[in-house]
Swiss-Prot record:
Organism: Clostridium botulinum (strain Eklund 17B / Type B)
Protein name (Swiss-Prot/TrEMBL): Peptidyl-tRNA hydrolase
Residues where tRNA binds: 14, 64, 66, 112
Molecular function as annotated in GO: peptidyl-tRNA hydrolase activity; tRNA binding
Class of this enzyme: hydrolase
GO biological process, any: rescue of stalled ribosome
Length: 191
């Protein structure tokens, strides 16, 4: 069983913000694999289904970004999911819009949602898919909570699709296979 977590902040005022790209990827996975995310528990909204004949749980924590680890820990403990089978998808300001980076472990890199997950799982060994949202030219908080432009949304459509494919590759093969296949991905469209 795999737990696939998209990081973001709950509430419509955060829709289409850079910090919520993880939620957008989860929504895309939900549509692609017909997995309804309609249950509330574990301080999040989630749904169960299958990807590549493996049972998966799609989770969007509703704790706000900085406490995401609370929700992840509750689901992982309840379903007895090992860290290696927890895939976390989130925004990365160090990557240009339209780029992806997959890692099997590592530090939080200044991302508070990842910092919370590492603290709650007591490990930094879990796969993650970083979706580039670009470098801020304004205050960091205003940037990550800011909305994407129409042009940025067009570029991100491709990134979201490839992030979805990356999740399937991790499940079917492993993290290294996904890294070899998708690391360095850059959307064909540019801004």
């Amino acid at each position: 069983m795999f737990l696939i977590v998209g990081l973001g902040n709950p509430g419509s005022k955060y829709d289409n913000t850079r910090h919520n790209i993880g939620f957008e990827v989860i929504d895309n996975i939900s549509n692609e694999y017909n997995i309804d995310i309609n249950r509330q528990k574990f301080r999040g909204v989630y749904g169960e289904g299958f990807i590549a004949n493996n049972k998966v749980i799609l989770l969007k924590p509703t704790t706000y970004m900085n406490l995401s680890g609370d929700s992840v820990r509750e689901v992982a403990n309840f379903y007895k999911i090992s860290n290696e089978n927890i895939i976390v998808i989130y925004d990365d300001i160090s990557l240009d819009i339209g780029r992806l980076r997959i890692r099997e472990k590592g530090s939080a890199g200044g991302h508070n949602g990842i910092k919370s997950i590492i603290a709650n799982l007591s490990t930094d060994v879990f796969p993650r898919i970083k979706v580039g949202v670009g470098q801020p030219n304004i205050d960091l908080v205003n940037y990550v909570l800011g909305k994407f432009s129409k042009e940025e949304k067009e570029v991100l459509k491709e990134s979201i699709e490839v992030a979805t494919n990356s999740v399937e590759e991790i499940i079917k093969q492993d993290v290294n296979s996904a890294m070899n296949k998708f690391n360095g991905f850059k959307a064909n469209k540019s801004i």
